[in-house]
């Protein structure tokens, strides 16, 4: 560090120290489920091992989620209509509950939706919700 700004140097060293303790990540290890997780904007992000771009990717997904929710609902609509008989997009969006995103698998899962208590709703996605695949409602 340059001696011209000793206060700044201490600040930077403090940040580096903090990052070392948390392994430089916002992810927290969940022993019960044996994975790492973090939450941004009410969205849970999980992974088995932390890759260097996961935090940035999680932030981008969290920022895009609200905007992409209507497209997610449209994509899930046929399965939801068949399983639960619900066709109103607003009702579906409000019923999905807290999303969980698996960064390793590229899946978006709803474990806490209010359409019933037996099934989980899951789908795969690419990029920042740019394409959707393989939706399923599992019981």
Which positions does each model-derived feature cover?
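General structural signal for secondary-structure boundaries
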Residues: 54-55, 59, 85-89, 125-131
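Acidic, proline/glycine-rich low-complexity IDRs
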Residues: 5-27, 32, 36-38, 91, ...
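Amphipathic protein-protein interaction modules
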Residues: 63-119
């Amino acid at each position: 560090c340059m001696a011209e700004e000793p206060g700044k140097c201490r600040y930077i060293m403090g940040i580096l120290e903090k990052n070392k303790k948390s392994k430089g990540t916002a992810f927290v290890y969940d022993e019960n489920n044996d994975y790492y997780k973090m939450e941004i904007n009410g969205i849970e992000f999980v992974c088995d091992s932390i890759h260097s771009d996961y935090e940035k990717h999680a932030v981008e997904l969290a920022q895009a989620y609200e905007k992409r929710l209507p497209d997610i609902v449209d994509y899930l609509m046929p399965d939801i209509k068949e399983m639960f008989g619900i066709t109103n997009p607003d009702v579906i969006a409000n019923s999905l509950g807290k999303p969980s995103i698996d960064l390793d698998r590229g899946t978006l899962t709803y474990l806490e939706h209010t359409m019933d208590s037996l099934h989980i709703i899951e789908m795969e996605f690419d990029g920042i919700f740019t394409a959707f695949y393989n939706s399923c409602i599992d019981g």
